[in-house]
From Swiss-Prot:
The lineage of its organism: Eukaryota, Metazoa, Chordata, Craniata, Vertebrata. This is Uncharacterized protein C10orf55. It comes from the Eukaryota. GO terms for molecular function: identical protein binding.
Amino acid sequence: MFLHLDSHSSLERTKPTVVGVDTHMELDEVHCCPGRDSGGGFIKGPMLQGLQGEGKLAPIPKPTLPSPSRLTLFVSSSQMEDHGFPARRNGLTQASFIYQMPAGWGSPGGLFLPCQPVPTPVVLKPPLPPCPISWGESGPAVDGIRRTPAP
């Protein structure tokens, strides 16, 4: 039931998320600012180290975060439901929590908009469309099976 609330909060959060994208751009510019590059080989050092030793660069790979960010958002929504975080109860808090994390990281903030972790739970609940189709074929048999795993 809270899935609808989540989607609602997502739509409402989509507007504030735009601000997050702005922040992400600013953060991205600050991190990859040419001033820092010319300031010293600080960026070159970590970058080279990252290519040679990815393990040590774990906390530095900001541009690499976008890919995991998708998984993070996906897992975050599932984890919140599993662990029963207060975010899940409020719905809005969930969006805020997920939106705050990527906003702080920078790059993920931009992916949060297209990613939209809200549609993920919707995909987890596809028994509605198949129910009527299966109902026409088998009937209560499939309906019962569908209801068992998802009470």
